[in-house]
């Protein structure tokens, strides 16, 4: 038993070195992308913004069917027609992911009309842009239900069948604010941190589930109407991401079976800095970069 444990202690660091080298090689050499021609994709919040761009990207890359969920029928109709004109079968369903029973009922309707969903993209989110003291007590549960609990419910609705088929992928469009919160968006930051923990736990839980994987995407501020008015101090140094870029990189991450994607890549430095710098230094970074007050000019869509 002792020799077995000693052997494991020797093998483990060698395993780590191998995996790091393998990942480094993967950054240099082009990897084979997953074929999407047999995949049925469901995107929550699919009517506009990043959701609409995701639908376009999946269609361009050959997804078999695309299903859109959202609360605004006009936007869903427009996106559905656009995807159909691209030659991809597309359907939309009115569904508030913050309503548990509505999620389960709509998921059943999707299975009956479209078939099994093999790629679920949890993209729907809301932001109120208020500090704790200014926030509406009735609005706070809404952000938690849509941004966090909605992912619990959609995943519970579709994951069991993915496990049966041994084919599935759960995607979470999160935010870098899950790792580094800002004042003035306390409800959004809290819900995104919860969603990040949910996906981290889910990803580890799927390790022994063949054919089923998960991807968490953490983008920087994206230029959509949802965060309209948000400003940082040096916009040329920290420009907002384009939704097309976020969508393209997200679908690529799915095709590469990448568990975690930070956008842009410089956001990896954020994790390192938070691990080594004292709190006072981190506070100065927030003030210097303008993230401390960036939400003051917020006038986006809630």
From Swiss-Prot:
Its EC number is 1.1.1.300. Gene3D superfamilies: NAD(P)-binding Rossmann-like Domain. In the retina, expressed in cone but not rod outer segments. The chain crosses the membrane at residues 9-29, 170-190, 195-215, 253-273. The active site is at residue 188. Pfam families: adh_short. Keywords: Lipid metabolism, Membrane, NADP, Oxidoreductase, Transmembrane, Transmembrane helix. It is a multi-pass membrane protein. It is found in: Membrane. It catalyses: all-trans-retinol + NADP(+) = all-trans-retinal + NADPH + H(+). This is Short-chain dehydrogenase/reductase 3. It comes from Bos taurus.
């Amino acid at each position: 038993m002792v020799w077995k444990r000693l052997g494991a202690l020797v093998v483990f660091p060698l395993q780590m070195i191998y995996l790091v080298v393998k990942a480094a090689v993967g950054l240099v050499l082009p990897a084979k992308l997953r074929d999407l021609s047999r995949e049925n994709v469901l995107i929550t919040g699919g009517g506009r913004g990043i959701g609409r761009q995701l639908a376009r990207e999946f269609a361009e890359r050959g997804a078999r069917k695309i299903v859109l969920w959202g609360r605004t029928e006009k936007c869903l109709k427009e996106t559905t027609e656009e995807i159909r004109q691209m030659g991809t079968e597309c359907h939309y369903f009115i569904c508030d992911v913050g309503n548990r029973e509505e999620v389960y009922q709509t998921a059943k309707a999707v299975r009956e009309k479209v078939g099994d969903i093999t790629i679920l993209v949890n993209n729907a989110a809301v932001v109120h842009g208020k500090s704790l003291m200014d926030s509406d007590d009735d609005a706070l549960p809404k952000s938690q239900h849509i941004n966090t609990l909605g992912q619990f419910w959609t995943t519970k609705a579709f994951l069991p069948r993915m496990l049966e088929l041994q084919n599935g992928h759960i995607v979470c469009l999160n935010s870098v604010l899950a790792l580094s919160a800002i004042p003035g968006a306390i409800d959004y930051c809290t819900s995104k941190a919860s969603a990040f923990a949910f996906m981290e736990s889910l990803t580890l839980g799927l390790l022994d589930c063949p054919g089923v994987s998960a991807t968490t995407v953490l983008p920087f501020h994206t230029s959509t109407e949802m965060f309209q008015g948000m400003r940082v101090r040096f916009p040329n140094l920290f420009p907002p991401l384009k939704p097309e870029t976020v969508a393209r990189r997200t679908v690529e991450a799915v095709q590469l079976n990448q568990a975690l994607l930070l956008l842009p890549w410089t956001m990896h430095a954020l994790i390192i800095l938070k691990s080594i710098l004292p709190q006072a230094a981190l506070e100065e970074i927030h003030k210097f970069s303008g993230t401390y007050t960036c939400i003051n000019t917020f006038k986006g869509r809630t």
